[in-house]
UniProtKB/Swiss-Prot annotation:
Organism, scientific name: Streptococcus gordonii (strain Challis / ATCC 35105 / BCRC 15272 / CH1 / DL1 / V288)
GO BP, sorted A to Z: isoleucine biosynthetic process; L-valine biosynthetic process
Pfam families: KARI_C, KARI_N
Active site positions: H108
GO terms assigned for molecular function: ketol-acid reductoisomerase activity; magnesium ion binding; NADP binding
Residues binding substrate, per UniProt: S252
Enzyme Commission number: 1.1.1.86
Listed name of the protein: Ketol-acid reductoisomerase (NADP(+))
Binding site for Mg(2+) 1: D191, E195
Reactions catalysed according to its record: (2R)-2,3-dihydroxy-3-methylbutanoate + NADP(+) = (2S)-2-acetolactate + NADPH + H(+); (2R,3R)-2,3-dihydroxy-3-methylpentanoate + NADP(+) = (S)-2-ethyl-2-hydroxy-3-oxobutanoate + NADPH + H(+)
Coiled-coil regions listed: none
Length: 340
């Protein structure tokens, strides 16, 4: 199904005007949404638990409250805490303070779609999901444009939920460059699949496998790192800018021929079947339940996965090589760490 891109001119109702907005969480997305909305003239407060994020929000000039206090004061509440803590945060501090006619928003549909959070029928539920990390949402806004976003309505109690979603997207700068309407189901399942099968899980597994093939064949680990990881950014940037066509126009004929001949030997029909199995586990809720149950148990699986990943040879080789390349990593990493 084709969807139509919408822009600022399509946001017909200033649905956030006169509303008190509470951004719950001051992490990667939270700081960006809050600051952008404030800069577009909206009345924004922050709800966050005591700690570094609380202090940072106050330092940035926001009226900062506990989550419960902010939820009680607000008309529109955007929950931007990590997915795994949203349920307990909502049940303990937000739900008891909701009133009929309030609106609750999310930047990802995980907890609503999989029904970890159930919002009363007299409250709107909407989504504004920028397609980029928070530091980029903020930086591009300050530069005069923005990051595209998806928007959705899960529950329209007041008849105004879509207007709120679109006006929120406008307030954070996304409508400057483009909005796409979606559903909670579609955004959640596609987002998780993209992360797991391609962007994060698939990509890192592909890089690691390539590194292992080369080093096991006797090639120097340092050279293998450059071939399968370091140069990845150069290729991805070309695809990002102009699709596969621009990338293939920019590489050598040798590389292009090898692309066509060998790509299908690596990503076979069996790999596609494996991807379908990943999608099925997302659709039926298995992944979501496994993730939430691991969090509730103290994150034993996630902790073990992190330790295993940190000890990969490619990570150790890369850390040493990057010391000799000071130009690598000069971006927003330090700013990003502040908010996580």
């Amino acid at each position: 199904m084709a969807v139509q891109m919408e822009y600022e001119k399509d946001v017909k109702v200033a649905a956030l005007d006169g509303k008190k907005i509470a951004v719950i969480g001051y992490g990667s997305q939270g700081h960006a949404h809050a600051q952008n909305l404030r800069d577009t003239g909206h009345d924004v407060i922050i709800g966050v638990r005591p700690g570094k994020s609380f202090d940072k929000a106050k330092e940035d000039g926001f009226d900062t409250y506990t989550v419960a206090e902010a939820a009680k004061l607000a008309d529109v509440i955007m929950i931007l805490a990590p997915d795994e803590i949203q349920q307990e945060l909502y049940e303990a501090e937000i739900a008891p303070n909701l009133e009929a006619g309030n609106a609750v928003g999310f930047a990802h549909g995980f907890n609503i779609h999989f029904e970890f959070i159930k919002v009363p029928a007299d409250v709107d539920v909407f989504m504004c999901a920028p397609k980029g990390p928070g530091h980029l949402v903020r930086r591009t806004f300050e530069e005069g444009f923005g990051v595209p976003a998806l928007y959705a309505v899960y529950q329209d109690a007041t008849g105004n939920a879509k207007n709120i979603a679109m006006d929120w997207c406008k307030g954070v700068g996304a409508a400057r460059v483009g909005l796409l309407e979606t559903t909670y189901k579609e955004e959640t399942e596609e987002d998780l699949f993209g992360e797991q099968a391609v962007l994060c899980g698939g990509l890192t597994a592909l890089i690691e496998a390539g590194f292992e093939v080369l080093t096991e064949a006797g090639y120097a680990p340092e050279l293998a790192y450059f071939e399968v990881l370091h140069e990845m950014k150069l290729i991805v940037d070309l695809i990002y800018e102009g699709g596969f066509k621009k990338m293939r126009q920019s590489i050598s004929n040798t590389a292009e021929y090898g692309d066509y001949v060998s790509g299908p030997r690596v990503i076979t029909e069996q790999v596609k079947e494996n991807m379908k199995a990943v999608l099925a586990d997302i659709q039926n809720g298995k992944f979501a339940n496994d993730f939430v149950n691991d969090y509730k148990a103290g994150r034993p699986k996630l902790t073990a996965y992190r330790e295993q990943a940190a000890n990969l040879e490619i990570e150790k080789v890369g850390a040493e090589l990057r010391k000799a390349m000071p130009f690598v990593g000069k971006n927003d990493d330090d700013a990003f760490k502040i908010y996580n």
